């Protein structure tokens, strides 16, 4: 009989959390962790903050020390890309052609940065998703060129613009939305963020990008400007394209049993097919509390969902493996599956601003923002959908006060009750 195996595809925060939880919950069989990057699991949020600032060296990003990874007894496949998954036979095919027979698979491949086709092959145009991306951008910003154009005014673009401005660069932040992060946080909070960026010297432009200008006609052409759709020319030594991401599901599209529209579609238990679960940025699952499908690209969710997927997979295997796992499944693993019902949390640091949010902000049909202290950049915003509060965001408030707002979202509370709760919390 072949050895029992679970494969976790994706070696970032969600994949690591899943691997650790599988061992903690009783899996003693082979545990394969596949990652397409050559690095051991590392933390991504500091790429646009501490690493870009120069405050951290790359080694500080590692999520676990080497001896901690060794203790997990992993079949570690770094620098290895998954090529296909056959859910009917639970066979994972790697890019080199190796085929792994699995009892279970957890997909945690995350997302890839979106790019602009007009920027292909241009030196000085960057994205920011991987460690290599961050190091390349950091090196570029350490050079003589001081003019940075950031294309995309979402969370990542705003964070990178803030860091570059603090490093002394001339920064122009370009976005289709009229205000920074407006698609996520709404107009009133967006106005507050816009005021902070302007006060720090960032130039804000609302426009689509029409193309790029570059010098030379050889194999290496250096970007010199960004052209906006209205014809405006923005001189640039460096360009960061931060226009969102695409779920890394291309390798799964050959299996008709999987729905890969906007991530890997899962049920409330994070299951995409029998024995196949998903976690992190790539997972689109049915949230029982919010009553709709969510795909959450937040660091905390990656860890929580990785653990949930591991627990639910082992609960399924405890019931379905014909031989009880042949010793690969400890008795403690035979627990019931549980729906994944997190209260999503994210944070963003921009200059001295600490932005924290609980719940779901996008898709809101109503918003109530309270500016507690405009001069001190302190504010709270409540987001609702269908008569209930679904999300809350705070800027500049003490952590304990922000955590107190979480209870309004966890249930979630009726809209009027939540509004009263916010007013009481900031009074």
Model-derived segments and spans:
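FAD-binding core/adjacent interface of flavoenzyme oxidoreductases
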Residues: 1-7, 63-149, 227-229, 238-242, ...
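Beta1-alpha1 glycine-rich phosphate/pyrophosphate-binding loop at the start
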Residues: 2-74, 161-184
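Mid-to-C-terminal Rossmann-like scaffold of FAD/NAD(P)H-dependent oxidoreductases
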Residues: 2-4, 284-398
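C-terminal catalytic lobe of FAD-dependent flavoproteins
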Residues: 5, 230-258, 351-427
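Residue-level detector of alpha-helix initiation sites
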Residues: 12-16, 38, 111-113, 132, ...
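A Rossmann-like FAD-binding core segment of flavoenzymes
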Residues: 28-30, 70, 76-94, 100, ...
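FAD-site-proximal beta/loop scaffold in flavoenzymes
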Residues: 123-144, 217-219, 227, 233-308
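Rossmann-like NAD(P)H-binding beta-loop-alpha module
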Residues: 136-185, 189
């Amino acid at each position: 009989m072949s050895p029992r195996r679970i494969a976790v595809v994706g070696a970032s925060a969600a994949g690591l959390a899943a691997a650790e939880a599988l061992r903690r919950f009783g899996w003693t069989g082979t545990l394969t962790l596949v990652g397409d990057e050559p690095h051991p699991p590392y933390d991504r949020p500091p790429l646009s903050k501490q690493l870009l600032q120069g405050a951290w060296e790359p080694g500080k990003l590692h999520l676990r020390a080497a001896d901690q990874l060794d203790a997990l007894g992993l079949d570690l496949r770094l620098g290895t890309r998954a090529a296909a998954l056959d859910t009917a036979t639970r066979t994972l095919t790697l890019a080199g052609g190796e085929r792994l027979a699995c009892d279970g698979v957890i997909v945690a491949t995350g997302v890839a940065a979106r790019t602009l086709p007009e920027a292909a092959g241009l030196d000085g145009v960057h994205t920011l998703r991987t460690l290599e991306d961050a190091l390349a951008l950091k090196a570029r910003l350490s050079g003589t060129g001081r003019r940075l154009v950031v294309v995309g005014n979402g969370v990542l673009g705003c964070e990178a613009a803030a860091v570059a401005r603090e490093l002394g660069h001339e920064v122009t932040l370009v976005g289709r939305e009229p205000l920074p992060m407006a698609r996520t946080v709404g107009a009133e909070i967006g106005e507050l963020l816009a005021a902070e960026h302007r006060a720090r010297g960032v130039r804000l432009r609302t426009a689509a990008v029409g193309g790029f200008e570059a010098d030379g006609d050889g194999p290496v052409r250096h970007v010199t400007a960004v052209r906006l759709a209205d014809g405006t020319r923005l001189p640039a030594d460096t360009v960061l394209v931060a226009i969102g991401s695409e779920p890394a599901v291309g390798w799964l599209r050959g299996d008709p049993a999987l729905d890969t529209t906007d991530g890997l579609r899962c049920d409330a238990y994070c299951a995409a097919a029998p024995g196949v679960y998903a976690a992190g940025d790539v997972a689109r699952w049915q949230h029982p509390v919010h009553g709709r499908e969510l795909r959450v690209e937040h660091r905390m969710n990656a860890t929580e969902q990785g653990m949930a997927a591991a627990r639910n997979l082992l609960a399924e295997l405890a019931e379905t493996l014909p031989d009880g796992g042949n010793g690969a499944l400890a008795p403690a693993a035979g627990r019931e599956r549980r729906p994944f019902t997190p209260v999503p949390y994210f944070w963003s640091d921009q200059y001295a601003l600490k932005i924290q949010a609980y719940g779901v902000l996008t898709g809101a049909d109503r918003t109530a923002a309270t500016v507690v202290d405009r001069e001190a950049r302190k504010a709270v915003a409540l987001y609702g959908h269908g008569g209930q509060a679904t999300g809350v965001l705070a800027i500049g408030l003490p952590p304990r006060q922000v955590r107190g707002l979480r209870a309004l979202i966890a249930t979630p509370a009726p809209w009027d009750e939540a509004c009263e709760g916010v007013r009481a919390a900031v009074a």
